[in-house]
Amino acid sequence: GSALLGYSRFHRYGLDIVAAFDKHPDVIGRVIHGREVLHISKLPHLARRMRVHVGIITVPADAAQEVANLMVSGGIRAIWNFAPAALDVPEGVIMQREDLYSSLGVLLQRLNAVLDPLHSQ
């Protein structure tokens, strides 16, 4: 999640990350790439107040559905999901899942083809 917070080119695509959330006391209150990390319970209220349309999930799989539910209750209409989990959201909420494991598999397969072209055919 902190890598996405630090990515400065999202604004070119109309995305401005306005807040970060966590539930761990040792993270809450820290400032990461200029944004204070807030307790996850504040997400719905802040999302509604700031009219946030897109939420980004970068939590472990077992926490992802809870975060998605909070986003939906805050009026978020599109979720960019980096968690390794399929999430259930209501109709009308757009979900884009980034499967890092599949991407890694493709990358390694392509690397093997370059490193050992005779055995990859």
Question: Whereabouts are the PLM-identified features?
Answer:
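Phosphate-bearing ligand-interacting subdomains
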Residues: 33-120
